[in-house]
Amino acid sequence: MKKKKALPSLLYLVFIVLLPWGVSSSFNKCLELWIKNWWNTRQSETLLTDIQEKRILERFIELEELSLLDEMIKGKLKTHVQKPPTGIHKEIIQWVKINNEDHLHTILHFSTNIICLAILSGSFFLGKEELVILNSWVQEFFYNLNDSIKA
């Protein structure tokens, strides 16, 4: 009888330990694409997409270079011409990408934590009987351990 009660409680313990890990990893993979898609569509309302932004910046750089070349040909510029500040554009784009990735990961972790909490809460409320069996099994184990230490 004790073995029959101990086996479901051990399975329940394994269920409580392994389920959140499995759910978290699977939801991270599944929800990541959905959240990125949602985030990019929301961002596209106010900002350009990365591809459009890169194309526009490349065109501006080409236009600046062409205008500098045109002015050099006309002889209006000195011989020491500095390059346009393209590094600033690249740094801003990199910073925006890092910031967006950070927001995406925060949303992803928050959503998976809520899902895991809901699953654990549901399994706790549905499995109170299993927890009682598990609790009595742990108490019996400690009593036996205490008796063996005294002996």
UniProtKB/Swiss-Prot annotation:
Localization, per the record, is: Plastid, Chloroplast inner membrane
Q: Which residues cross the membrane?
A: 7-27, 107-127
In alphabetical order, the GO MF annotations are:
antiporter activity
Q: Which GO terms describe its biological process?
A: potassium ion transport; proton transmembrane transport
The record's GO CC annotations read: chloroplast inner membrane
User: What's the name of the protein?
Assistant: Potassium/proton antiporter CemA
Membrane topology of this protein: Multi-pass membrane protein
Family per similarity comment? Belongs to the CemA family.
Q: Provide this UniProt record's keywords sorted from A to Z.
A: Antiport, Chloroplast, Hydrogen ion transport, Ion transport, Membrane, Plastid, Plastid inner membrane, Potassium, Potassium transport, Transmembrane, Transmembrane helix, Transport
Q: What does this protein do?
A: Contributes to K(+)/H(+) antiport activity by supporting proton efflux to control proton extrusion and homeostasis in chloroplasts in a light-dependent manner to modulate photosynthesis. Prevents excessive induction of non-photochemical quenching (NPQ) under continuous-light conditions. Indirectly promotes efficient inorganic carbon uptake into chloroplasts.
Superkingdom field: Eukaryota
Q: Which organism is it from?
A: Aegilops crassa
What reaction(s) does this enzyme catalyze? K(+)(in) + H(+)(out) = K(+)(out) + H(+)(in)
